[in-house]
Amino acid sequence: MDVSIQAQILNLLMDLQEERGLTYLFITHNLSVVKHISSEIAVMYLGQCVEKAPADELFDNPLHPYTRALLDAIPVPRLEYRDKTSVIRGELSNPIDPAPGCRFAPRCDHCTEACRNHDCQLRDMGEGHYVACTLYEK
């Protein structure tokens, strides 16, 4: 879809949301659209929510390694403004019959034995920010 048409449609959706009190559920990989239209974001990986937060908080302070990698992959106009680049390596888990533990573990640079052995649950990190990652276990 042409970018200008896409912007017009998104603006129309936002106007309708404000006028009629609508709620939308967007499923997309286009993080620019997500940031523009969302007040709250849930990041999913192989069917599991790995992070959930208000939009500004998620973009300013991503906690889960997958969320960080997604945000690092957003193109920036000038390379000198890019702080870091995360590359997701490793093999995808089987989405039909996933191994125990975090589904992102086979591709995570921070993976520990705990990640491989138990499913992480969303933890409240404050300010409406939740993350499912052993890096944030107490």
Predicted regions and their residues:
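P-loop NTP-binding/switch modules centered on Walker-like glycine-rich loops
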Residues: 1, 5-83
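Charged, flexible cofactor/metal-binding loops and thiol motifs
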Residues: 55-138
